[in-house]
Amino acid sequence: MQTSPLLESLMEALRCLPGVGPKSAQRMAFHLLQRNRSGGMRLAQALTRAMSEIGHCKYCRTFTEQEQCTICANPRRQQNGQICVVESPADIHAIEQTGQFAGRYFVLMGHLSPLDGIGPMDIGLDRLEDRLATEEISEVILATNPTVEGEATANYIAEICVQYGVTASRIAHGVPVGGELEMVDGTTLSHSLAGRQKITY
């Protein structure tokens, strides 16, 4: 079946989004054209502006339109002395929603993966090392993902922290709140047991 070249182009473009296959892209394209053209125009304008104007914070590497993101520019955050290392800007958003962290961040934009040719320089560890050398940092909280690559990356950064006399800590991983032990996989349960905490009264 032949369709409009522009429609085909739209569907192909939508497929660059994660989890969007041919059918989903087709549904989205037809919905925008058939029922929500104004929404499609807003999406196009927002996407164009975001792609052209959003860059990276020169300190933590998260997404921002400014040279420095709002978190790094906050004087209270600067005085905290803690840096939380994450793999992506999305992780910052998740941690900020908890309201439990008052320090600053450093975004790796990935993790170490020798098999894929991704080394320390590719994830900005030279810039993190510069911060450890020049800023008054008391603790680096390693919040990389609980994967083989994430653990390897955390261990590598912890070794760098030792060289600068900075405390390195790892976020806890374990049984989710409301979860049942019999449904939890062995690896997660092992992390839970290893990261157990003493109950004090």
Swiss-Prot record:
A GO MF term: DNA binding
Pfam family, one: RecR_HhH
GO biological process: DNA recombination; DNA repair
Family annotation (InterPro entries): DNA_Rcmb_RecR, Rcmb_RecR, Rcmb_RecR_Znf, TOPRIM_dom, TOPRIM_RecR
Keyword DNA repair: yes
SUPFAM superfamilies, A to Z: Recombination protein RecR
First and last residues of each zinc finger (C4-type): 57-72
Family annotation (PANTHER family): RECOMBINATION PROTEIN RECR
Record-stated family: Belongs to the RecR family.
Function: May play a role in DNA repair. It seems to be involved in an RecBC-independent recombinational process of DNA repair. It may act with RecF and RecO.
Family matches, as NCBIfam families: recR
Designated name of the protein: Recombination protein RecR
Species the sequence originates in: Photorhabdus laumondii subsp. laumondii (strain DSM 15139 / CIP 105565 / TT01)
